[in-house]
A protein has these predicted regions:
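Soluble extracytoplasmic regions of secretory-pathway and membrane proteins
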Residues: 4, 11-934, 938-958
Length: 960
């Protein structure tokens, strides 16, 4: 073959390779452009360099070791081949290889080096933490080593040792095969089956393998600090008294085996090393597995408290520190009966009660404020804003782009016209219209275009020759932000066309040199791409700050290697939660903020004491922004994350105790209170019919899953401390506790945990503990509200005829030294597609008495006769929903039952038994249905009106 022909073939092969790899290369280039567009090109290169370094070191390391070993095997080949079955195999190998043995060895070493070494790039995060490790300032009580060793160094060291062991096993197999092909190993020959030189070579390799295993045993000692063998996690009695000595013994034996392999080179061959390896295996089974199991069963379990006492104390202290529970303020209170005078003094706390529910009102917001099908309300969040001169709870939602609602779904429509959402919707959480709808706030001044959001798939191209869809009440204008990548070159457009598989990106005349392609538009994906080592909260929320709409995402740093700390119970977290994984240390160290208009990602460090975030800051200089640069207008809207609070409260019920006996026996332990069911048919059982979420915890384990029913979810509120200024509320998360019981029968309120989101006291955990006679807990209150003879008929009547009743969040309001529980009641059509939701009633409970009112003011005044307060939570706007049917406006409860003496009735009825009236009303409704089926609309209306009159009379008799 001529030289020119060879060159042509090489060029052709390179062209084919280039075509096949074009999309990969384009993807790499597009990634680089994206990182540059968010000013994080340094992060891109830092991660890439770390991956290249690891892949190169481990690949080259394996290739060098294997090449040296294979070269030695080649040079130690016997010159003369004795007669035998293997002779022909060796001769054929030598004839085939000829003078190309060096090239063959090099090729084998490189190929296997890449196979074994390239996967090491997955360890880039552990490697960076290893390089930039920090001190926790706390040493573990067993080995006296700083916790930073376990978090930052041990993971990577363990990987290196495990990799080295597996790599050396592969080298040994490759070397043995080379010795066989060279004639040094003669499997079927009698007598000596390996040459002396081959035996020396293999002995050295086996000795190295034993040394690596000794290093593995040494590292396993430190892994005991997160052992789960005992009653709690960490190195407990069996680990310290049995497993640790066994590992120390195995270290000595493995080193002895290494020495014997070297000694066997000169004396005695392999017999002694092989015998020692057999002994090693026996000791590994007996001392490493059987003996600890025997100690655990026959020494520890019969006397757990005595044996594990010191180790439980270690676990409690470490868990409190690792989970941020080591600085909880405790306030002891005694619940007393509140008075009308207390109510008059508590107008502000009561008026801060939230009437709107984030779950139920999302549909209402979408119906009222969605405006067009191509916009959607994906989530509703609780925040606080200045309303009428006072900071109040506010429901906030972003009006985001809905790709499914885009008309005429062409490429131009999806990517050039409908490119963004429009604005933020807000309503007071504590006020509603007279017909039970939200009161939307005006005057939120912010640029409305939202190019990134919570559910924004695909990409958008701005500044094209196609005008974008303008936000309502605004005119279309060119994009003025910095988000996205400029498509100002043929190379860029071709790269995006290849990566996204869309030819229009390359060929469309609508795209100009000023056009920008904005992709990765989901805010969580955007932050994850910049900082993949952070665990992100599942609930980003919009904040209006300095004329901008900003998305705030709580970001966590976690590890599962904090010595002696208990793993978090994450059973009740959502699948998308950033904390839905195994960990025993957590900090909400970072607030990620994304500009909804220009996509800028800013990572604010809000906990500079966290060694993990400090390590990442060292690894990526410039990636994080210090807390002192957070604008005050933004900081005022930071919220303590719900999922972190869930984890902490799940643990605190037991980990509040430092006393080992109290911790172990759980005599005074707490559980998170049982949930209050939302559906009327589930409410009378006080939570017994709720969904099973956990297994009942055993009293003698470290498990913190306390019960087999759903738990009370934490909620945001303007909390007014019973010990402080009653008119000063702090935006907080609240979650109640009940006394622990393995069968979940205890439902009294034992304590409240409250965590502040206010800038001055952010993250401060406070527990209000109730002593003496315990007040009723939320499950009991919910049951009494639902089964009350005055309330139950109203709920029953509202929950029929095409309507469905849903209970809102059960909220606790301290009034004086007493506790008032408040719960809004919603009515919506019994149609899964309907979005109409109305606040129809408010339930209130105090000291065993339950009432219902059309408004919160009415309910409180009934609960406390003589209070005569006006909370101002209902505003008559005079606006009704056009073209909609209110599923509660014609219900019997709209008549104010407080204006009629309950001992009187309509003179025309002559009936004083409400049960009879309700039966007659039911009969009239049946007759109305029959008339409707016959097409007699006049008779239908008459029957319905008569039935409603009877129901109103029944309610008067019931005092409702």
């Amino acid at each position: 073959m001529s030289k020119g022909r060879i060159i042509l073939l090489v060029i052709a092969a390179l062209l084919v390779l280039l075509v096949l790899s074009a999309r990969t290369l384009a993807g790499f280039y597009v990634d680089l452009l994206w990182f540059d567009s968010v000013n994080r090109g340094d992060t891109f290169w830092a991660v890439l360099k770390s991956k290249i370094f690891l892949g190169a070191v481990f690949s080259v390391g394996f290739a060098v070791v294997s090449f040296i070993s294979l070269t030695l095997a080649e040079r130690l080949a016997p010159a003369d081949l004795p007669e035998g079955p293997e002779r022909e195999v060796v001769q054929r190998y030598r004839m085939f290889v000829g003078k190309r043995t060096r090239i063959l060895r090099l090729a084998i070493s490189i190929v296997f080096g890449l196979i074994v070494g390239v996967p090491a790039i997955a360890q880039w995060q552990d490697w960076l933490l290893f390089r930039h490790s920090k001190s926790f300032g706390v040493s573990d009580p067993q080995f006296g080593v700083d916790a930073g060793f376990y978090v930052f160094r041990l993971p990577f060291l363990t990987f290196v040792v495990d990799w080295a062991f597996a790599a050396l096993v592969l080298v040994i197999l490759m070397t043995a095969a080379m010795h066989f092909l060279n004639g040094a190993v003669r499997v079927q020959m009698p007598g000596q089956r390996i040459t002396k030189s081959g035996r020396v070579h293999m002995s050295i390799l086996f000795s190295m393998l034993a040394v690596i295993k000794a290093a593995d045993y040494w590292l396993q000692r430190f892994e005991l600090t997160v052992s789960s063998r005992g009653v709690v996690q960490g190195a407990t009695y069996t680990d310290v008294k049995a497993q640790l000595p066994a590992l120390n013994l195995l270290i000595l034996i493995s080193l002895l085996v290494a020495v014997l392999f070297i000694a066997g080179i000169r004396w005695g061959g392999w017999r002694l090393p092989l015998l020692s390896m057999a002994l090693w295996a026996v000791v590994a089974v007996v001392a490493g597995a059987v003996y600890p199991a025997v100690i655990q069963r026959f020494v520890v379990q019969p006397n757990v408290t005595t044996r594990e006492r010191d180790y439980i104390a270690r676990n409690v202290e470490a868990t409190q520190r690792a989970m941020g529970l080591d600085n909880v303020q405790v306030v002891n209170l005694t619940a007393e009966e509140a008075t009308a005078a207390d109510v008059k003094a508590s107008v502000v706390p009561l008026s801060d009660t939230r009437l709107l529910d984030v779950t139920e009102m999302k549909d209402r917001f979408a119906l009222d404020q969605g405006q067009f099908a191509f916009y959607s309300i994906n989530d509703l969040d609780v925040d606080r804003y200045d309303v009428d001169g006072r900071v109040q709870q506010t429901m906030v939602a972003a009006r985001e782009l809905n790709p499914d609602g885009i008309p005429n779904k062409t490429w131009v429509s999806k990517h050039l016209i409908y490119t963004h959402g429009c604005g933020v919707v807000a309503a007071s959480a504590s006020r509603v219209t007279s017909d039970g709808r939200p009161i939307y706030e005006d005057g939120i001044d912010a640029r409305p275009q939202l190019y990134v959001g919570t559910e924004q798939p695909g990409y958008a191209i701005v500044n094209t020759n196609q005008v974008e869809q303008a936000c309502p009440n605004t005119e279309a204008e060119p994009y003025a932000g910095v988000a996205g990548v400029k498509l100002n070159s043929t190379v860029r457009r071709l790269a995006y066309a290849l990566t996204l598989g869309e030819f229009n990106l390359f060929g469309s005349s609508l795209i100009t040199d000023e056009s920008r392609l904005i992709d990765v538009r989901d805010v969580r994906d955007r932050v994850s791409k910049v900082a993949p080592f952070l665990h992100l909260d599942a609930d980003p929320y919009p904040v209006v700050s300095e004329g901008k709409v900003l998305w705030v995402i709580d970001a966590f740093t976690t590890t599962s290697r904090y010595p002696y700390a208990q793993q978090a119970n994450t059973d009740n977290l959502s699948a998308s939660s950033g904390l839905n994984h195994t960990f025993n240390y957590v900090r909400n160290s970072v607030k990620a903020v994304v500009d909804a208009y220009d996509g800028t990602v800013t990572l604010y460090v809000v906990d500079a004491t966290d060694p993990i975030v400090l390590a990442w800051s060292s690894a990526f200089p410039g990636l994080f922004t210090p807390a002192d640069q957070i604008p005050d207008s933004l900081r005022a809207h930071f919220r303590y994350p719900e999922d972190l609070f869930r984890v902490q409260t799940n643990l605190y019920g037991r980990y509040q105790f430092s006393d080992v006996d109290q911790f172990f026996n759980r005599d005074a332990a707490w559980s998170v209170a049982q949930a209050a069911p939302r559906e009327p048919e589930l409410s009378t059982g006080a939570g017994d019919a709720t969904t099973v979420v956990d297994e009942t915890a055993q009293a003698n384990t470290g498990d913190v899953a306390d019960a087999n029913v759903a738990r009370f979810e934490p909620y945001y509120t303007m909390f007014h401390s019973p010990e402080g200024d009653v008119d000063t509320g702090t935006f907080s998360l609240v979650r109640p506790f009940v006394p622990f019981s393995s069968d979940d029968t205890r439902k009294e309120l034992r304590a409240l945990m409250v965590v502040s989101s206010e800038p001055a006291t952010y993250g401060q955990l406070k527990v209000y503990v109730y002593d003496g006679t315990l007040p009723a807990g939320p499950a009991t209150v919910a049951a009494e509200l639902s089964s009350n003879p005055t309330i139950s008929p109203v709920v029953t009547l509202l929950d029929q005829r095409g309507s469905r009743v849903i209970f809102g969040q059960l909220q606790l309001v301290p009034v004086g030294k007493g506790l008032v529980w408040v719960r809004p009641l919603y009515v919506r059509p019994d149609d899964s597609g309907s979005k109409q939701v109305f606040v129809r009633r408010v339930l209130a409970w105090h000291d065993g008495e339950a009432v219902i009112g059309e408004t919160l003011t009415e309910a409180i005044n009934r609960l406390f006769p003589g209070a005569n307060i006006d909370l101002g939570e209902t505003v008559d706007t005079g606006i009704q929903d056009p073209g909609t049917t209110d599923p509660g406006t014609t219900d019997p409860g709209t008549t104010d039952p407080g204006t009629t003496d309950p001992g009187t009735t309509d003179p025309g009825s002559g009936v004083t038994d409400p049960a009879v009236l309700l039966e007659e009303a039911q009969s009239l409704f049946d007759e109305a249905d029959a008339a409707l089926r016959d097409g007699d609309l006049g008779a239908y209306q008459d029957k319905v009106s008569e039935a409603q009159d009877l129901i109103a009379q029944a309610l008067v008799l019931l005092g409702a």
